[in-house]
């Protein structure tokens, strides 16, 4: 599906009736984006402007995409789906050594 709520993704769904669906909820360009936003005053391409810096950002689509899939094809309420994560956020959880090893960047 996706990597995190700050990005976007794709989802394939196989329904009980055998129908297969594909949902694209990748990041989208901001509303103020324009066709010439990566060009300098002379109309030449600004190197790497689409890769780095504030002009390279997109509007995340993950939350909208997951919500769309749940609303259109789901069988549970948003509350039911989110309850386990809400419980973990409220009560916390113990990390295993394997968890901390993955998170260790030193």
Question: What spans do the regions from the language model cover?
Answer:
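Noncatalytic scaffold domains of N-terminal-nucleophile
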Residues: 1-106
């Amino acid at each position: 599906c996706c990597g995190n709520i700050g990005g976007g993704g794709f989802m394939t769904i196989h329904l009980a009736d055998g129908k297969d669906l594909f949902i694209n909820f990748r990041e989208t360009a901001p509303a103020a984006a324009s066709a010439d936003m990566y060009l300098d005053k002379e109309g030449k391409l600004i190197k790497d402007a689409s890769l780095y810096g504030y002009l390279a950002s997109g509007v995340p689509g993950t939350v909208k995409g997951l919500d769309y899939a749940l609303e259109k094809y789901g069988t549970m309420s948003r509350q039911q789906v989110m309850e386990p994560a809400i419980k973990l956020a409220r009560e916390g959880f113990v990390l295993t050594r394997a968890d901390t090893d993955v998170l260790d960047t030193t």
